[in-house]
Structures are given as structure tokens and as C-alpha cells.
């Protein structure tokens, strides 16, 4: 759904950004007994097929590709760096004159929420397209939706 939406609406955006976990040694983020809130089973391990973008997302040829969580837990795309330039997302968005963000993807309760909250904190107008994201659980999704709404994130369906 995400790749189809972005492909259909790419001309509406000045910049397309992808982000992905790229864990090298994320410390206590990985656990043999994860709580699925702060600790997780191994995932997004750098250099593995599982860490790669889905082929449909990779085919979008994003303007900025963010890797995050190399050496610690990092839910927000603002915590990572662009693969090509090694620059942080905030700097790259500012340099492009971007002032608003539409955030989609997985998981609404974690990475989407933290990226949206950081975007608002950094002065962007932020929307999350509710039909293009899913939480880890309904309960965590409700909590994330409340946090985002309270912070000024607009939660809306996409136009498709």
C-alpha cells in the first residue's frame, strides 16, 4: 500500500525519504525475551536481506535513505543518517526547504510515532496517514495516536 501510494503521488512531494533499521550493535535493544515495547528479537541487522527495504519501496528511488539504530535503539528517522551523505535527516530537510511531512510505514506505535513527534518538535507540520501504517498492538497504537494528537500531529487517511 505504501509503495503504491508514494508511486502514485510522488509528483506531489518535493522529497521522498525512506528509513530503515540498520542494527550493527544496538545493545539492549535486542533481547532473547523481548517485551515488544523497549526490547525486540533481532531484526533489521545491517547487511542482511531482512534489513533491506522491500523491493517495491527500493524501486521508488527515494531522495534520502535513512539508516537508524546502528548502535542503539532509534525509533525516529531523525535519529539516523542518510546513507549517501552521512548527514542527519533534519539538516537535509532544512537544506531542501521542506516545511511539512507526511509519515507512513511501520510501526505506527513506534517508528512512525517517534518520527512524527520529532518532526513537530523540529517545527514541521506533520500528518500521519492512518491507512498507511499499523501499530505493534491496538493498545500501543491508541497510546501513540493520543501522543501524536496531543503534540499537534494530524492523523488522517490518505486520499487513496
Q: Predicted regions span which residues?
A:
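Catalytic phosphate/metal-binding cores of nucleic-acid and nucleotide-processing enzymes, i.e., regions
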Residues: 2-3, 85, 100, 108, ...
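Active-site alpha/beta core segments
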Residues: 3-100
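Histidine-anchored nucleotide/phosphate-binding helix
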Residues: 6, 110-121
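Gly/Ser/Thr-rich loops at beta-strand to alpha-helix junctions
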Residues: 23, 107-111
Amino acid at each position: 500500500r505504501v509503495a503504491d501510494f508514494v508511486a502514485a503521488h510522488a509528483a506531489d512531494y518535493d522529497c521522498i525519504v525512506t528509513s530503515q533499521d540498520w542494527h550493527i550493535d544496538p545493545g539492549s535493544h535486542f533481547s532473547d525475551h523481548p517485551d515488544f515495547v523497549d526490547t525486540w528479537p533481532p531484526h533489521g541487522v545491517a547487511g542482511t536481506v531482512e534489513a533491506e527495504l522491500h523491493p517495491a519501496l527500493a524501486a521508488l528511488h527515494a531522495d534520502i535513505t535513512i539508516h537508524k539504530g546502528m548502535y542503539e535503539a532509534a525509533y525516529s528517522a531523525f535519529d539516523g543518517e542518510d546513507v549517501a551523505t552521512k548527514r542527519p535527516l533534519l539538516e537535509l530537510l532544512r537544506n531542501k526547504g521542506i516545511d511539512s511531512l507526511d509519515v507512513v510505514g511501520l510501526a505506527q506505535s513506534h517508528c512512525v510515532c517517534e518520527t512524527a513527534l520529532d518532526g513537530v518538535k523540529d517545527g514541521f507540520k506533520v500528518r500521519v496517514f492512518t491507512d498507511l501504517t499499523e501499530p505493534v498492538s491496538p493498545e500501543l497504537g491508541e497510546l501513540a495516536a493520543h501522543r501524536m494528537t496531543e503534540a499537534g500531529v494530524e492523523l488522517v487517511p490518505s486520499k487513496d
